[in-house]
Amino acid sequence: MAVGIGIGLGRFPFETGRQYFDWVRYCEAAGIDSIWQTDRLVSKEPNLETLAAMAAIAGATSKIRFGMNVASIALRDPLITAKQCATIDRLSDGRLLPAFGIGSALSRDYL
């Protein structure tokens, strides 16, 4: 049995997009198994839109898996979200790890 290592990204701590992609490629080269992007549509801290980030990671890498650290399906059209996920998964050769939830009562973006 193997134990995988995943890294979660709750906000966008990088100064530039280039720094982000350098970090993503570093994670892949270092043998990290997966990158997880938190889904926050409203936040005081900078962060990326989850599905756009998944598509970007898919295009910048070839091995590492990636997923959303629970996308709020209550704020998204289910059919469009399913199609976006299917497209990203297909173009990444099955590396997308989708995760969905209804949101949190503790966060304004889920109201």
Task: Please annotate each region the language model reported.
Residues R40, V70-S72, I102:
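Residue-level "edge-of-site" marker
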Residues V3-E15, L75-L111:
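Flexible, glycine-rich active-site loops centered on histidine and acidic residues
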Residues A60, F66, A71, T87, ...:
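Glycine-rich, flexible loop/turn motifs
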Residues M1-T61, R65:
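N-terminal beta1-alpha1-beta2 module of alpha/beta enzyme domains
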Residues K44, M68-R76:
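Active-site nucleophile and cofactor-binding loops and adjacent substrate-binding regions
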Residues W36, G67, L97-A99:
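Conserved beta-strand positions in the central sheet of alpha/beta enzyme cores
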